């Protein structure tokens, strides 16, 4: 079982390069996966197949995408830029 110290930083928990999954939640718009992929491709070019799941009421979609992260700066930049997409509500 992994126990994480509350003072531990994400960069101290990861060894790069590593597999890293982003879960982006936003309004149920058909362009959501495209906008997420556009940001991902800018910082981690590759061939991705994001998984899209609707919420129970269908108002929101979650887009999960796994990348090979090369640095903590890349991870943080992607969190920031994914969160700035106009139809995104949350990035995990």
Curated annotation (Swiss-Prot):
Signal peptide positions (record): none
Highest taxon listed in the record's lineage: Bacteria
GO cellular component, one term: cytosol
InterPro entries tied to this protein: UPF0250_YbeD-like, YbeD-like_sf
Listed Pfam families: DUF493 (PF04359)
PANTHER family: UPF0250 PROTEIN YBED
Protein family per UniProt: Belongs to the UPF0250 family.
Name recorded for this polypeptide: UPF0250 protein VV0902
Source organism of the structure: Vibrio vulnificus (strain YJ016)
